[in-house]
């Protein structure tokens, strides 16, 4: 099964869906564009995209470097279509997987019609923040830059002036961004205002994707990520970063039941034991937590089978990276 994910339909939005799917209903002044979410790991890029879309397209966790691929999230309204490009956090890579992730983020910059540079305003700028600001200035000089000061809910009152000023000055003496907004993606603070700023930057253009499509990810790809999300949730230390998930089979057994089989790859035998757990309890816990999310994705019951396999040092092995879909 290789099916792109679309918005759920109900009686309330049925007519709206029909209008969004009708090419004749697109107004002549329709706006559209690709908007890249850029920033270091764990600043809230995926959370922001999910919240703006009103649905979960990208997995989230407190762990840095959760996002490994560029993921599109598509917002379609009668007057505009925004294609958000959620990207891996830009960091200083230590292995080929990290290089792949950073390249995926960097390649999104010149492709974007607008850039959301996201930072964690509750802490002072890091060297990575400064590097990313320069990367944006040099890599996309013509695209509007919106500086998103996220995690405002964690910002202490006495920090506001100093932290904001430090981020405003990241690009040097000259103003390097077009507008800024303080937000809390988790609480939904100021997101309507941010969306207005994003739409204001968009050029007039066509509807690039069908009006009911919300992502470029297939059900199989999202299911793999939903399983990995639970591994991130329940494991500790180096194990979460050493895991990759591949869905081997995604098959409808009836109109109300899908069968999903997936391999969880780790780098060492000791990690395999941790994920399986005593008497298989950890693996059962991961499966039990992932299954309801996959059922919400498919709208059916899901029979989920998980297998744990060792692919030694796969993050440093180019051939294994390709096998796991990272090349």
Model-derived segments and spans:
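P-loop NTP-binding site
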Residues: 219-327
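G-domain G4 guanine-recognition motif of GTPases
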Residues: 87, 119-122, 146-160, 181-190, ...
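Canonical P-loop GTPase G-domain recognition
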Residues: 143-144, 153-215
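Conserved C-terminal guanine-recognition region of P-loop GTPase G domains, centered on the G4
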Residues: 79, 103-178, 251-254
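Conserved, well-folded catalytic cores of nucleic-acid-processing
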Residues: 55, 74, 78, 93, ...
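Conserved G1/Walker A P-loop phosphate-binding module
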Residues: 13-103, 107-109
């Amino acid at each position: 099964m290789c099916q792109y994910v679309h918005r759920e339909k109900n009686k309330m939005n049925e007519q709206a869906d029909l209008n969004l799917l009708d090419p004749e209903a697109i107004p002549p002044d329709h706006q559209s564009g690709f908007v890249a979410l850029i920033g270091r790991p764990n600043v809230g890029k995926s959370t922001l995209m999910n919240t703006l879309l009103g649905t979960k397209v990208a997995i989230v966790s407190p762990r840095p470097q959760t996002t490994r691929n560029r993921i599109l999230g598509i917002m379609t309204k009668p007057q505009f279509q925004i294609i958000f490009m959620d990207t891996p956090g830009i960091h200083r890579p230590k292995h080929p997987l990290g290089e792949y992730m950073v390249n995926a983020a960097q390649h999104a910059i010149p492709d974007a019609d607008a850039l959301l540079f996201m930072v964690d305003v509750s802490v002072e700028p890091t060297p990575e923040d400064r590097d990313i600001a320069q990367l944006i200035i040099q890599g996309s000089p013509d695209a509007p830059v919106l500086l998103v000061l996220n995690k405002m809910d964690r910002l202490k009152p006495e920090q506001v002036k100093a932290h904001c000023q430090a981020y405003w000055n990241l690009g040097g003496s000259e103003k390097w961004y077009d507008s800024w907004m303080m937000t809390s993606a988790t609480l939904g603070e100021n997101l309507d205002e941010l969306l207005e700023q994003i739409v204001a930057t968009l050029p007039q253009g066509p509807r690039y994707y069908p009006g009911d499509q919300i992502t470029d990810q297939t059900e199989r790809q999202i299911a793999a990520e939903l399983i990995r999300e639970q591994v991130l949730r329940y494991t500790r230390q180096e194990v979460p970063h050493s895991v990759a998930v591949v869905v081997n089979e995604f098959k409808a057994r009836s109109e109300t039941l899908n069968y999903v089989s997936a391999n969880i790859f780790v780098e060492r035998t000791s990690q395999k034991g941790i994920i399986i757990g005593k008497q298989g309890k950890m693996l059962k816990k991961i499966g039990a937590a992932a299954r309801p999310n996959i059922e919400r994705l498919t709208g059916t019951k899901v029979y989920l089978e998980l297998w744990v396999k060792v692919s030694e040092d796969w993050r440093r092995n180019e051939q294994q990276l390709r096998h796991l879909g990272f090349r």
